[in-house]
Amino acid sequence: MKIIILFILSFPALAFAKLQIATTTTDLAAVVKKVGQDQIEVFAIAKGTQDPHQVEAKPSFMIKLRSTDLVISQGLELESAWIVPLIHGARNPKLTSKDGLFELAAELDPIEIPKGEISRAEGDVHPGGNPHFQLDPIRLGKAAQLIAKRLGDLDPSQKDFFQKNANTFQKEMTEETKLWQERIKKSGVSEIVTYHKTFSYFCDRFDIRCAVQLEPKPGIPPTASHIISVIEQMKKRKINVVLIENLYEDSVGAKLKNDIPNVVVKRVPVSVEGEPGVSTNEELIERLVKAVEDGRH
């Protein structure tokens, strides 16, 4: 009799246990929340104000991962320096299996895939392409579809629920993108300068050229000679908008303001929760679109 009572008491907890999801970034956590809603619990390892290339593999993260069903990452080696050590340190069989880490970027038509041999002399180059798809709303919609399928595999009873939510999110992203594209086109801004190649997908989606970075090479801090070259290019090509990711110091921005008349330098978030008031993927893209609009002719 006691055994039967214990089974009955434990059944609700088993039946309604929520999936425990970890993401490497706040951007992915925001998408997972849209797809999973009240049927999942999710936490992001990197903060929205952190450079996802450089996150400390803390023991506290390993403890959290011990009860996690799945880790979702952007991939393409963005988090490779720390996510694998964290997973191994957690000693969670669910995560060390081949399906424990779900990397998204490779499934989302990556851009800027380098050709030929790659050496460290070229900076922090990602062999599989640029991993920063979080600033492209269309790819975020596709990511939601991939996430819904994986969550449905883990919890088949909620498969239709996850799929419905992913469809809704993707539709919203598609509709918002059309409006954002119209606004950027109306702004007249066709080219910007950025610190790192974080904006490549954003620029590609919104038809903005962003071939000039303040970094001489990916992951290499700006040098005096390179900044002189950047200023020359900006004057020659009449670029008057600079977006500096708030992950990096912006002392270079002051120099650009001194050397280039009417230049607009904006320090902006590039992840959800990267600054107050940016708690969703939509709010992040909106923030960046407004930053571009501020540089209108």
Positions of PLM-derived features:
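Positively charged n-region of N-terminal signal peptides that target proteins for export
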Residues: M1-I4
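N-terminal signal peptide c-region/cleavage motif recognized by signal peptidases
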Residues: S10-P12
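Extracytoplasmic metal-acquisition and chelation regions
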Residues: K18-H297
